From Swiss-Prot:
Region span, Disordered: 1-24, 230-377
Family assignment from sequence similarity: Belongs to the peroxin-14 family.
Domain of life: Eukaryota
Basic and acidic residues bias spans: 360-377
Subunit record text: Interacts with PEX13; forming the PEX13-PEX14 docking complex. Interacts with PEX5 (via WxxxF/Y motifs). Interacts with PEX19. Interacts with tubulin.
Ranges of biased composition (kind: Acidic residues): 323-342
Residues exposed to the Cytoplasmic side: 127-377
Topology term for the membrane: Single-pass membrane protein
Assigned GO CC terms: cytosol; fibrillar center; membrane; nucleus; peroxisomal importomer complex; peroxisomal membrane; peroxisome; protein-containing complex
GO MF annotation terms: beta-tubulin binding; identical protein binding; microtubule binding; protein transmembrane transporter activity; protein-macromolecule adaptor activity; signaling receptor binding; transcription corepressor activity
Protein name per UniProt: Peroxisomal membrane protein PEX14
Recorded name of the encoding gene: PEX14
Listed Low complexity bias regions: 1-15, 244-259, 265-275
Modification N-acetylalanine, positions: A2
Organism annotation: Homo sapiens (Human)
Amino acid sequence: MASSEQAEQPSQPSSTPGSENVLPREPLIATAVKFLQNSRVRQSPLATRRAFLKKKGLTDEEIDMAFQQSGTAADEPSSLGPATQVVPVQPPHLISQPYSPAGSRWRDYGALAIIMAGIAFGFHQLYKKYLLPLILGGREDRKQLERMEAGLSELSGSVAQTVTQLQTTLASVQELLIQQQQKIQELAHELAAAKATTSTNWILESQNINELKSEINSLKGLLLNRRQFPPSPSAPKIPSWQIPVKSPSPSSPAAVNHHSSSDISPVSNESTSSSPGKEGHSPEGSTVTYHLLGPQEEGEGVVDVKGQVRMEVQGEEEKREDKEDEEDEEDDDVSHVDEEDCLGVQREDRRGGDGQINEQVEKLRRPEGASNESERD
């Protein structure tokens, strides 16, 4: 069945127009070449082969071309020996290949393209794995070297900058150290000067203290000497209110006036002679008072009231001086005593003594009624 179908297929082109008979039909020739190259067909004689090809619609030219291409034109069937009868050999069925249309060509091209693509892919993989590393290895090394050189240049620049900064900082630190040393030297000079000034001041202060001590001692000596030798006693005086008033007589008006003036004069004389220094310098007032007294009243004037008061005041002053001496002995630090304080103490002592004397004298001068009124007030 297959051989009949194959025989029918090449018979179809015979019904084509005459243009196809003129041109050789390559597919038919190719099938004829394959048919002639078959080992069984080659054993058959040429006449039978030609006759079979003509039956299939091949022309003589095409048959000749098929014989030339197949190379079986000189083939002759081998002698089978003497035979009485020739057995007709049936020609084998020609296996005619079907007519390949244009789609089969595209398939062949596609398969070829796929094969070429596979080969190209293989070459590409080989190129990537083996050839590229060999080619690009040197380039990468060069790039790495360039990178290393760039990094080294950057590092050298940064190191140079840091070195310059360190040099500037060291210079500034050295300047600061020099300034600090200068300040330390100035402070040392100032301390030495301060020590010298303090020593000189201390010496001056000690000298001043010694001078003050000597002055204080001299003042104490003067005070003690003044108090050891009491002032010269003055004549005793009697207040005016104790003097008996005599009746005035017309024969002696001057005496009355003088006696009335004598009542006032003792007060003035006493006020002028309030201080002990002044008492010694006012003897005239005392003589006046005693000159006015009569011979009967001289015995009463012997009573020295003022001397008693003065003795009492001197006793109190001596007690105070003893207390002050004890306090001075207890106080070791006499360096801070000022001359003004000493003078103030002296003035207070003087005022206290004189004031007490004056108060007692005034009490003696005043009458009892006046003293009571003053106490009530």
